[in-house]
Amino acid sequence: MQQDYLSQQRFSALPLHPIVRGALAKKGFDFCTPIQALSLPISLNGRDVAGQAQTGTGKTMAFLTATFHHLLTHQDPNLEYPHPRALILAPTRELAVQISNDAEFLAKASGLKTALAYGGDGYDKQLQVIECGVDILIGTTGRVIDYVKQGVIGLDEIQVVVLDEADRMFDLGFIRDIRYLLRKCPAPQARLTMLFSATLSYKVRELAFEDMNDPEYIEIEPEQKTGHRIKEELFYPSNQDKMALLLTLMEDEWPERCIVFANTKHRCEEIWGYLAADGHRVGLLTGDVAQKKRLSLLKQFTDGDLDILVATDVAARGLHISDVTHVFNYDLPDDREDYVHRIGRTGRAGESGVSISFACEEYAMNLPAIEEYIGHSIPVSQYETEALLELPKPYRLKRAVPPQGHTRHRSYHTK
């Protein structure tokens, strides 16, 4: 993390529980990010907070630090807690898993138990873990409601509630589910409630604040919606040149870790086929990919076993993957806010990043709304058709995926 990105607030100077302070220090957390520096003095004092900050600014560690501190300072050693004391809700299962992973070092240090509850996979396995006892339940609304209605867990002992990517949960229509779960928890005055998101509309704040106790709203205003450390670039390819331009730019840029976004599952599969045939270590992440495969792909990408991830917007929000160097918008998104969410995968936590977008014949009409929303024109670059790489015969999904150890190379084509 870049030092100039951090604030002057040290974690060691905050009134943290000694176990939390020690775990953070051991993990290398010294200075707070701006959102942490603003939110923690509020939440550590037991007051509700709604935090808005640009993607990748440390929101997750802000609410995890406050959650573990609150539970450790509000527990009776003479009591056993058969049900969860904290509930962390996320819009997607991938984000829930990432929050759980981020919480591991705090759980290990504190002895507090975390458990996951998300749909699509592992129902019985998740149930077994929860039945063994859980202090902090992290999950998606649907699966948590299932367990509540079955009597597997109760929410009457909840001391902390977190809504992560809150606006996304409202956008996805989870408002009724959220309110159902919050009504099962103690009253807002009897718990600590935190909302964090990259964007929090007035409507979302109004709805959410009905279930919060006089929250304090804080915001880290970015220099621009897209992040000043992201270098943006725009091409106007013909539909015929589009795929060849992508492969050529991959060779020219040689990204260390890259996400390519497209608007449809079919287009993602097509892109994957050409990139795989061109010798790239590439994974495909769409809504149709089985849950175990999705988690495996994300781990491979995070661990560096895959260099490129081709994804629909199912992966555009909440994926906390560090060191993404490049984002390609193969298709300009129909929703202008998705442009910000997509390219927010790079340039995180003070690092620099590159965003390259294609305004093709099919989606160029989306560009004016995007540029109006981000408040600036995206710099345009030119290309020469005769300099584009020749397209290989693409792989199809029914064919075997190249071995993960397949080596990327620059000599596959002659430029």
Curated annotation (Swiss-Prot):
Protein's cellular compartments: Cytoplasm
Residue ranges of the motif Q motif: 9-37
An example Gene Ontology molecular-function term: RNA helicase activity
Protein name: ATP-dependent RNA helicase RhlB
Listed EC numbers: 3.6.4.13
Reaction(s) catalysed by this chain's protein: ATP + H2O = ADP + phosphate + H(+)
Main EC class the enzyme belongs to: hydrolase
Annotated ranges, domain Helicase ATP-binding: 40-218
Annotated InterPro entries: DEAD/DEAH_box_helicase_dom, DEAD_box_RNA_helicase, Helicase_ATP-bd, Helicase_C-like, P-loop_NTPase, RNA-helicase_DEAD-box_CS, RNA_helicase_ATP-dep_RhlB, RNA_helicase_DEAD_Q_motif
Phylogenetic classification of the source organism: Bacteria, Pseudomonadati, Pseudomonadota, Gammaproteobacteria, Pasteurellales
A Pfam cross-reference name: DEAD
Function text: DEAD-box RNA helicase involved in RNA degradation. Has RNA-dependent ATPase activity and unwinds double-stranded RNA.
One biological process term in Gene Ontology: RNA catabolic process
